[in-house]
């Protein structure tokens, strides 16, 4: 789903910025990889902004950038409850979830694509027999509706936020992904684009790579302070020959 930025007291503010080191990502020393979807392997921020603006305009509520910043790691249900409370809406959160799903599905079906360089990296992992998984707060219904991304082909192993007890503010989803891949979290590298998720992946014991999302929700310096590695563009990874 969407993205959230939460300033955490555990954020390593004094840590040096993670190096932009695409060469560290191939050959991959870790036994497995875990990928976020929205903002990391797919640029969907503009789709959610379109949904948010239309949703708020329908209720005569001005759009502000802090609204999407509070939603995505919450997941759909918790995000809908937050929206009802924030704007004092006399609406059922379940109805809001259905509205978001309907609006976003129409956009994801035709507009969502993988970032340039992602498929080449996934193919390299497959050829090298390195297992990997998708770990996302998005929903199966939404991702499986996409016409331009074959989610099952590219991500046969998937963990959805609704399958674990807590949001990406906690390490649950990364621990579950590692379990499904048959490795320890410490043997995984996690690719994420926002601070809260990177912190949680660290807490799970994973190596982390912050991916440049190119959207206003990302604080580049913050994610580089948290992550072990920084990736500006998937096409920068020097795959060469396997």
Predicted regions: what they are:
Residues 133-134, 210:
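Hydrophobic beta-strand core positions in alpha/beta domains
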Residues 13-128, 152:
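N-terminal helical cap/lid subdomain that shapes the substrate entry/recognition surface
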Residues 114, 135, 166:
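Residue-level marker of regulatory loop/turn positions in helix-turn-helix DNA-binding domains and
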Residues 41, 135, 190-191:
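Conserved SAM-binding loop
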Residues 62, 131, 207:
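Residue-level detector of anion-binding/catalytic polar loops
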Residues 2-31, 123-126, 139-140, 144-242:
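Asp-based, Mg2+/Mn2+-dependent phosphohydrolase catalytic module
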């Amino acid at each position: 789903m969407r993205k959230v930025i939460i300033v955490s007291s555990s954020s390593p503010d004094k840590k040096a910025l993670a190096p932009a080191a695409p060469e560290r990502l191939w050959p991959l020393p870790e036994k497995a990889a875990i990928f976020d979807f929205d903002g990391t392997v797919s640029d969907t921020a503009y789709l959610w902004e379109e949904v948010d603006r239309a949703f708020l305009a329908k209720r005569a509520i001005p759009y502000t950038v802090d609204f999407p910043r509070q939603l995505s790691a919450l997941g759909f249900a918790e995000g809908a409850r937050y929206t009802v409370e924030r704007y004092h809406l006399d609406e059922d959160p379940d109805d809001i979830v259905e509205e978001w799903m309907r609006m976003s599905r129409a956009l994801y079906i035709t507009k969502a694509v993988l970032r340039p360089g992602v498929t080449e990296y996934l193919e390299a992992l497959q050829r090298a027999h390195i297992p990997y998984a998708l770990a996302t707060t998005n929903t199966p219904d939404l991702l499986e509706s996409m016409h331009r991304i074959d989610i099952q082909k590219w991500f046969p192993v998937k963990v959805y936020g609704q399958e674990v007890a807590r949001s990406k503010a906690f390490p649950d989803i990364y621990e579950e992904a590692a379990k499904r891949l048959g490795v320890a979290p410490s043997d995984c590298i996690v690719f994420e684009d926002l601070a809260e998720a990177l912190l949680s992946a660290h807490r799970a014991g994973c190596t982390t790579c912050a991916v440049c999302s190119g959207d206003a929700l990302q604080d580049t310096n913050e994610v580089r302070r948290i992550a072990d590695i920084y990736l500006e563009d998937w096409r920068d990874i020097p795959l060469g020959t396997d």
